[in-house]
């Protein structure tokens, strides 16, 4: 389903109605309010998710401080960057050049060397004699992965050379652990219908799980890491942290690269800390966490989500916008899923659809402050887009919020009526209700460049948003559906398939994992950008899917985070690399 833009008809001019509000005033098209404390006398009959308080309080955020000061290392960092650029020119061997590009990217340094990486890949893509031999499995697989990852048109037919006369991959390949690992990673960038890559994935995963003998410990570590989750599915900033530590263990590491990666990670971490402090103050001033006690207060978790989706340091404004959106989505989701009655939710959905401050008059007290927070924050975001890029984005932002609330109300009606949707019916609504289109839509207009509206209706863009959101939804369902159904929520994808196909939960879970694989294939086809300016959105779409795997890999990392989730937050936001 393509996102359709509304005809711009929204006006910032409204006649406010201060009904039952203590204070109401406009500030730059924004309404600030304090509402009388909501009554909880009607708690009887309302559901509860029993969410625990966040592991992170404002004191943790405000005391975040890194000893690392980039200004103290500026000249050294410039020298290291010069060393790396010189190295990229010095290396002549095509395989070594590709390995260097791969290492730079995995260390989290790709954004610093975009121009140089593009030059290398252009040379490789246009050279008909990149390799004198096509028998090097590692080289062929690495070339395929890098080119496809960067949007070049590349065929997987080269892998047929590694098959025997019976049509299967040669058993002799099992001795080449490095090549097998490269093929395994490359297989996760497949498109639908690329059977050879499906076969490659099955072949490599089976044999890599069974490796034994005297194997290089660093290579073995990489194999186990990839089998746990392939690189293409991993949250890239956490992956950079892991790879920096792993690269340190390699005998052939380049000292300049290793040093630069640590300095860059620490430098970017200080940017994240500054942004998180600003977001924490915004959330505290907004007051929703205190007013709506039934909802999840997950500001740090939302910021962690955001850094996974938009991690390049230059997109600080976009991270701020997306953090606000993520926390509002989390709150409104709890209004629909946990607290609101069907009658109240119908009113709230109508109010969002109208996008008029007067629509608040019909809402109960707890919804007024929620609606006003949504209205104000969205208008603030739109004001920045108008001021910085000259774009009136209100019609589009209103559209994605309305679509989200309408998808929520569909699920609320299903729950109220005891209706069990088919899997297809559920997913057609659920890829919207997971809020991926809201997140990516806001991100698109916050990258700091003038983005054309019509690009959001390109088939490639619509497909990216849908399949990224679908992966998000299915990963969420695998981790959270049991708890949500136990508290009386609408059946999720697992339960829908169980009812429809008459299978066990275990079989249904395997089917959902299969759907995730298929969604990745469809999304991989979006790697080729129709226009260059869409690249930040393409990156964000893929990173949204990666964050879904990260957050829901070991349970509900958003609603009920565990010690592993806590450790990940600390690694990304609080623990810099130490220098001797």
UniProtKB/Swiss-Prot annotation:
The protein's role, per its UniProt record: Monoterpene synthase (TPS) involved in the biosynthesis of monoterpene natural products used by traditional Chinese medicine to treat headache, inflammation and intoxication. Catalyzes the conversion of (2E)-geranyl diphosphate (GPP) into alpha-thujene and (1R,5R)-sabinene.
Domain notes: The Asp-Asp-Xaa-Xaa-Asp/Glu (DDXXD/E) motif is important for the catalytic activity, presumably through binding to Mg(2+).
Transmembrane domains' residue ranges: none
GO CC terms, sorted: chloroplast
Tissue specificity remark: Mostly expressed in developing and mature fruits, and, to a lower extent, in male leaves. Barely detectable in female leaves and shoots.
Gene behind the chain: TPS3
Similarity comment: family membership: Belongs to the terpene synthase family. Tpsb subfamily.
Keywords from the UniProt entry: Chloroplast, Lyase, Magnesium, Metal-binding, Plastid, Transit peptide
Protein name: Alpha-thujene synthase TPS3, chloroplastic
Organelle targeting sequence: 1-26
Annotated GO MF terms: alpha-thujene synthase activity; magnesium ion binding; sabinene synthase activity
Catalytic activity from the UniProt record: (2E)-geranyl diphosphate = alpha-thujene + diphosphate; (2E)-geranyl diphosphate = (1R,5R)-sabinene + diphosphate
Gene3D superfamilies per record: Farnesyl Diphosphate Synthase, Terpene synthase, N-terminal domain
Disulfide bonding pattern of the chain: none
Assembly and interaction partners: Monomer.
Motif (DDXXD motif): 333-337
Cofactors, names only: Mg(2+); Mn(2+)
EC number, as in UniProt: 4.2.3.-, 4.2.3.110
GO BP terms in the entry: diterpenoid biosynthetic process; green leaf volatile biosynthetic process; monoterpene biosynthetic process
